[in-house]
Amino acid sequence: MRYADPSANRDLLGNRTLLFIFICAFALVTLLQQILYSKSYIKRGFQFGWQRGDQQANWTGLFNDSDSPTEQNITGSSSRYFEFYKEPLEFNSTRCLELRQEILEVKVLSMVKQSELFERWKSLQICKWAMDTAEASLFKSTLSRCCNAPSFLFTTQKNTPVETNLRYEVESSGLYHIDQEIFKMFPKEMPYYRSQFKKCAVVGNGGILKNSGCGKEINSADFVFRCNLPPISGIYTTDVGEKTDVVTVNPSIIIDRFHKLEKWRRPFFSVLQRYENASVLLPAFYNVRNTLVSFRVKYMLDDFQSRQPVYFFHPQYLSSVSRYWLSLGVRARRISTGLILVTAALELCEEVHLFGFWAFPMNPSGFFITHHYYDNVKPKPGFHAMPSEIFTFLRMHSRGILRVHTGTCNCC
């Protein structure tokens, strides 16, 4: 005879009970981690964009350590938890100094997750950027000693006399002999001098510019640098502006899209006309491959009786700039044209603003963006160190040396 076990259908600390206990424990641990480690809840919290005209709110837990006069707490019991800002905080306010330090304490990009860097950067946007004159002057003095853009940014008759054997930047064993014909292509001396322009805009081509509405602010700058013949007319003008004082041309564009200017030249001439009287800047002495095609741009504009000046980077300047940024941790086979222009702008301008510089697939709010504002073509991997360059710019922004624009603009 078989006897039934009266406890057979009971779940006394059985599988279901253990599973329930495990789920509860996991949830509790997760909650504790959020409370203890997530700065989103205690330190920086949720914030709303100034561009939409909303108030800024910081979840501050049970403390308020800010002494800025622009901050006002909500009345009532909730004032212990929320802190609202009706306008941006001063860059040197106590709260902003803390937020700036949170960027600066990250020495290398690999120290934090990308999402954490974005969060710190978003938090800093409640602060109204202001140039730190002492920091900027110190940084510019180091550039003056190492690179000296006012003397060596372009190849000139003054810094490269006739009969000079000019050494290429990359192919260090190669020399280019400067004869009388080539010498005549160079300007007599640098057309710009130190701190000549009050406010400069260096415009990159990043997808972060799309739908930014920054065109008017870019156009309001005293001097505007652009990289590699980007589109600026039609649907793009609202976001990127159209004012251009210097535009660089990568010779690979001429080689791939315009057949080295060996046949038809008018299509390329038409492209340059979109930049009106902007100076055209080429790396003719980067390597042997670039030289002849760069010279052809000068010949072409002369043939069409264009007034657009054509300048060539001085290879000594390019080498010096590369060594300088390498010493600051930017390691790449070649630094980007954008970084070269930013370096030059810091010497030629009192105040430097960057637009379109972003090297991540998402914007600071976590939304996917295209690589460029006009297409989504990715660069060859391993050639530039764009994330490292952008990270360096964010640190320079935090130090008050230059300003990086990554949001929408409300200028003018």
Swiss-Prot record:
The EC number(s) this enzyme carries: 2.4.99.-
Membrane topology, from the record: Single-pass type II membrane protein
Residues annotated as glycosylated: N58, N64, N73, N92, N277
A single cellular component GO annotation: Golgi membrane
Swiss-Prot/TrEMBL catalytic activity: a ganglioside GT1b (d18:1(4E)) + CMP-N-acetyl-beta-neuraminate = a ganglioside GQ1b (d18:1(4E)) + CMP + H(+); a ganglioside GD3 (d18:1(4E)) + CMP-N-acetyl-beta-neuraminate = a ganglioside GT3 (d18:1(4E)) + CMP + H(+); a ganglioside GD1a (d18:1(4E)) + CMP-N-acetyl-beta-neuraminate = a ganglioside GT1a (d18:1(4E)) + CMP + H(+); a ganglioside GM1b (d18:1(4E)) + CMP-N-acetyl-beta-neuraminate = a ganglioside GD1c (d18:1(4E)) + CMP + H(+)
GO molecular function annotation: alpha-N-acetylneuraminate alpha-2,8-sialyltransferase activity
Recorded family membership: Belongs to the glycosyltransferase 29 family.
Protein name: Alpha-2,8-sialyltransferase 8E
Organism of provenance: Mus musculus
Taxonomy of the source species: Eukaryota, Metazoa, Chordata, Craniata, Vertebrata
Gene name as annotated: St8sia5
